[in-house]
Amino acid sequence: MVNRSDLVVIGISVGLALGLLLALLLFFAIKWYYGRSHLRRCANEQNSPTLPVHTAKRGVVIPDDRANTESSQPPENGAPTQHQPWWNNHTKDLTVSASGIPRYNYKDIQKATQNFTTVLGQGSFGPVYKAVMPNGELAAAKVHGSNSSQGDREFQTEVSLLGRLHHRNLVNLTGYCVDKSHRMLIYEFMSNGSLENLLYGGEGMQVLNWEERLQIALDISHGIEYLHEGAVPPVIHRDLKSANILLDHSMRAKVADFGLSKEMVLDRMTSGLKGTHGYMDPTYISTNKYTMKSDIYSFGVIILELITAIHPQQNLMEYINLASMSPDGIDEILDQKLVGNASIEEVRLLAKIANRCVHKTPRKRPSIGEVTQFILKIKQSRSRGRRQDTMSSSFGVGYEEDLSRVMSRIKDQHVELGLLAGVKEENHQERNIATT
């Protein structure tokens, strides 16, 4: 006969067994439920893929509508459509990304640009078109080209960085488009175009006076200073050039095109060569390692462009090296449009800064903060009326006659330096042939 204590033990054992069984069933049920949810999420992600974009503090996801957006046609070169205030009666497919930048669909930009009719320029990302946005403001729509050297990575970098970087000397990104295969970036409209066009655009282009060039150098320096010393983490631009310096209606400069930019997490970083020939730091070219001083080198080249109006791809550095053989060599390669309208002392001071920036040893180049202070001192000296040596005053009596003589001398010097640079290039090519 089973006693009461045995019944109690049996009851407890059965209860524990049932409890354990129920716990196991509950565990497997939860695991099955989450497994189904995960599979469902994966299926949704395959149907609506996304492009991850990372900001300094959180991930930003730019939806990719290649799989679920209504079909749209690429820009055609036909006649422009009649422009109408489409935003008054059109419900835009407009969202705001986590970075705070509005997102437009392809048809929005197509209408804003009047079917991509007015071309403002052409860059490494693709053509740039004039646009009128829903709020009536002018904008520049940069459209990713099929033969572009840049892709989704550069596009994501631009949206990510400009979503968190804001400064008066950086071009403002006001919107973007990700619609099927279309990638577009919408910027504030810069009415005076690029510094490159103003310096080399030929006849009919506005001539930049010396005061404007000095201010442009300071504006660029402020923009880079924000990237290097104000942003957290710091940002290296990696493609500073006159084509990426844009000017507004007041000739104030802003740095543009951040597709190749990198956040600085180490003192120096290794990368495949990216940038533009003529502006790239020779140390970066030889080592594949870039630092903030690589940006300083590129900025130095831009300053020399402002002084000489000689393009880096037209042997600018050869001219500079040859001119440095003479104490007043920079005077000889000064942009002819500035002769008689610039302070020689200021030109020499700015050239001195530029030469430090393009020093072959990166550690001997100044920081961007130092460059800014140097340029500010030149401007402050100008504002206090401390200019002591202008070309017009240095010529003295018979100014017009002397000016004509100086112009002739500068032209002769340009020709002579060009011949010397050509000879040096021929010798370099002969050495290359001899070694192959």
Curated annotation (Swiss-Prot):
Stretches of Polar residues bias are at 69-88
Q: Does the keyword Amino-acid biosynthesis apply?
A: no
Report the subcellular localization. Cell membrane
Catalytic activity field:
L-seryl-[protein] + ATP = O-phospho-L-seryl-[protein] + ADP + H(+); L-threonyl-[protein] + ATP = O-phospho-L-threonyl-[protein] + ADP + H(+)
Query: Which parts of this chain are annotated as the region Disordered?
Result: 65-88
- The keyword Nucleotidyltransferase is assigned to this record: no
Describe the location of the Protein kinase domain by residue ranges: 114-375
Which residues are annotated as active site?
D239 (proton acceptor)
Q: What InterPro entries would the database entry show?
A: Kinase-like_dom_sf (IPR011009), Prot_kinase_dom (IPR000719), Ser/Thr_kinase_AS (IPR008271)
List the taxonomic lineage.
Eukaryota, Viridiplantae, Streptophyta, Embryophyta, Tracheophyta
Family per UniProt? Belongs to the protein kinase superfamily. Ser/Thr protein kinase family.
Q: What protein name applies here?
A: Calcium/calmodulin-regulated receptor-like kinase 2
User: How does this protein lie in the membrane?
Assistant: Single-pass membrane protein
Instruction: Quote a single Gene Ontology cellular component term.
Output: plastid
Pfam families, alphabetized: Pkinase
Principal cellular location given in the protein's record: membrane
Q: Which residues form the signal peptide?
A: none
> Which residue ranges run through the membrane?
7-34
Write down the EC number. 2.7.11.1
Q: Which GO terms describe its molecular function?
A: ATP binding; protein serine kinase activity; protein serine/threonine kinase activity
Identify residues that carry Phosphothreonine: T276
Q: Which UniProt keywords apply?
A: ATP-binding, Cell membrane, Kinase, Membrane, Nucleotide-binding, Phosphoprotein, Serine/threonine-protein kinase, Transferase, Transmembrane, Transmembrane helix
Which positions does UniProt annotate for ATP binding? L120, G121, Q122, G123, S124, F125, G126, P127, V128, K142
Q: What class of enzyme is it?
A: transferase
Which residues, renumbered to this chain, carry the PTM Phosphotyrosine? Answer: Y187, Y284
